[in-house]
């Protein structure tokens, strides 16, 4: 089974520029242990703050954060954030300021959410986990989304988290899940802090 997920990124750049076989080979050859944040890879077309339409969106991207414990346990999270609000959000071009999506909704904005709000992530750890335990970690890690993104987990979101474990470190699954939650939260913040203006969307 090969798991996969995508986010809507067709509003920035050439919407017909689909990845092809050659790009797959180039990506594999360029693989390294360095995680690139900001407008790289899947983060190139990621945006936030679309509650009032794409014209009010801001730029987002990819983010990474790793937590390492003294005993040797490592839990990292790589996130591509394509949603509504965090440190970035709905940008009012007329008022030249960021507007809170939460406050807009409380003020009576009832616009239907688009299908362009998705956050996907991968939790990577050296813990020894079974497939079932990886699923538990992914579930717990979703709380990291809830702690950093508003709104989140709507019916139009394709939010997903995959967990990979290398099996080198024996520890409790709940410990990994707890650390994964915080790693996800901080990776979302990293995605916003390391982005840049692109395609008419300011950072």
What do these predicted regions represent?
Residues 1-203:
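A structural signal for small-residue-enriched, beta-sheet-centric alpha/beta enzyme cores
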